[in-house]
């Protein structure tokens, strides 16, 4: 949070210098012009804190989390490019497929649902569809002031609590956000 907060003056200056704003019009619900770079401080803070946490607690986990961090970085960079220069839908989908592939083919996939173990191909397909679906669901509501941030906060808080109750270290990464 502190890194995000400290980065805001620089982000506002960059938005002003390069005129990177979402301008108010009759279809927008925000009042005034809003920087399109708001997520930059949050994303950079998240990546720095996550990598620092992993390296300071158990550096052997770095390569376990690297595909997920890399996928997040790819989605972030192309999301930023899309905010500044609108990308075609096919380009966004290809980027999502590449990022999702990083995650899945590094062994991160749904292996079971409840007590039921998933067949390998179903596991890959379900994980792929879920990741792409979540990316697009959040992208869809991103233009609605406060909704995406509120839903993200609620989701991460819930996951953090679930991981804490199950003694999973991923809880710390959830709470870093």
Task: Label each residue range with its predicted role.
Residues 1-177:
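"…together with the soluble PPM/PP2C metallo-phosphatase catalytic core" -> "…together
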């Amino acid at each position: 949070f502190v890194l995000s907060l400290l980065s805001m003056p620089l982000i506002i200056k960059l938005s002003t210098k390069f005129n990177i704003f979402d301008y108010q019009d009759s279809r927008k619900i925000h009042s005034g012009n809003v920087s399109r770079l708001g997520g930059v401080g949050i994303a950079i803070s998240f990546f720095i804190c996550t990598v620092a946490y992993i390296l300071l607690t158990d550096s052997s986990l770095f390569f376990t989390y690297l595909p997920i961090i890399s996928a997040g970085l790819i989605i972030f960079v192309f999301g930023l490019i899309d905010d500044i220069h609108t990308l075609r839908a096919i380009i966004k989908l290809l980027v999502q497929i590449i990022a999702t592939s990083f995650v899945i083919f590094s062994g991160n996939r749904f292996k079971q649902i409840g007590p039921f173990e998933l067949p390998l191909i179903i596991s890959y397909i379900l994980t792929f569809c879920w990741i792409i679906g979540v990316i697009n669901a959040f992208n869809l509501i991103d233009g609605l002031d406060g909704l995406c941030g509120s839903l993200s906060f609620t989701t991460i808080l819930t996951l953090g609590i679930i991981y804490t109750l199950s003694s999973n270290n991923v809880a710390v990464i959830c709470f870093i956000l």
